[in-house]
């Protein structure tokens, strides 16, 4: 962040009429105290800005006026070529601004202090260990069933986003959205039981690096299989039933539920 330092020398104040004259379209008529030389009249010489080594006592408005003046110089209609380049102002910016780091001690859920970085995504299909595919049955419900032939195209493609969360050697936080749809798997409490649902989101806001915890799953690799544990409800996993054509749900791995999946990457 750039701030204007307090300086220790007097400079004449500009009033609005002087500023209007200073920024006249024809050309600047005079520049007070800021430059030792500024020659616009000689067609054989380029514009040269010379900065006094003595710090000047400028308010922020005067500093901005200087920058606006330079912008006006760029736009002046002159018949002679100028060698005034974009990099020229950099020589005196250090006299006006001081650079300070922006520090953040904590993160909060309203994302006001979170600067999202580009999200790494992987498109994939998931099948349970019985080779049942996941399909979108109702507008907001996934079901697991066996597909073959032309029906194989019905299985959903997930957009797996690698998000912020508690990362360990065997757990990677991810969010699971349905590719091409504004739907994400999320975990909420319903009637006292952790429940898996498909939640509609604003595509302008999602995906993002810091997803709400209900959207986050810990991807756990077990040999050639993967499991997805809810970050909101530890020890509860995305599960399928032993039976055919049953909804995908959140289970607590009691031995009857299927929690192991194979992941098939899909080109984007």
Swiss-Prot record:
Positions of the propeptide removed during maturation: 1-116
Domain of life: Eukaryota
Keyword Glycoprotein: no
Entry GO CC: cytosol; extracellular region; extracellular space; lysosome; secretory granule; vesicle
PROSITE patterns in the cross-refs: INTERLEUKIN_1
Positions in coiled-coil regions: none
GO MF, one example: integrin binding
Alphabetical list of InterPro entries matching this protein: IL-1_CS, IL-1_fam, IL-1_propep, IL1/FGF
Pfam families, per database record: IL1, IL1_propep
Localization: Cytoplasm, Cytosol; Secreted; Lysosome; Secreted, Extracellular exosome
Keywords from the named record: Cytokine, Cytoplasm, Inflammatory response, Lysosome, Mitogen, Pyrogen, Secreted
Site-annotated residues for Important for interaction with integrin: 171, 179, 190, 204
Induction behaviour: In pancreatic islets, release is increased by high glucose treatment and, to a lesser extent, by endocannabinoid anandamide/AEA. The induction is more pronounced in Zucker diabetic fatty (ZDF) rats compared to lean animals.
Any Gene Ontology biological process: positive regulation of RNA biosynthetic process
Location (main, coarse): cytoplasm
Family: Belongs to the IL-1 family.
Assembly mode: Monomer. In its precursor form, weakly interacts with full-length MEFV; the mature cytokine does not interact at all. Interacts with integrins ITGAV:ITGBV and ITGA5:ITGB1; integrin-binding is required for IL1B signaling. Interacts with cargo receptor TMED10; the interaction is direct and is required for the secretion of IL1B mature form. Interacts with HSP90AB1; the interaction facilitates cargo translocation into the ERGIC. Interacts with HSP90B1; the interaction facilitates cargo translocation into the ERGIC.
Described purpose of this protein according to its UniProt entry: Potent pro-inflammatory cytokine. Initially discovered as the major endogenous pyrogen, induces prostaglandin synthesis, neutrophil influx and activation, T-cell activation and cytokine production, B-cell activation and antibody production, and fibroblast proliferation and collagen production. Promotes Th17 differentiation of T-cells. Synergizes with IL12/interleukin-12 to induce IFNG synthesis from T-helper 1 (Th1) cells. Plays a role in angiogenesis by inducing VEGF production synergistically with TNF and IL6.
Name listed for the protein in its UniProt record: Interleukin-1 beta
Organism: Rattus norvegicus
Top-level taxonomy: Eukaryota, Metazoa, Chordata, Craniata, Vertebrata
Gene: Il1b
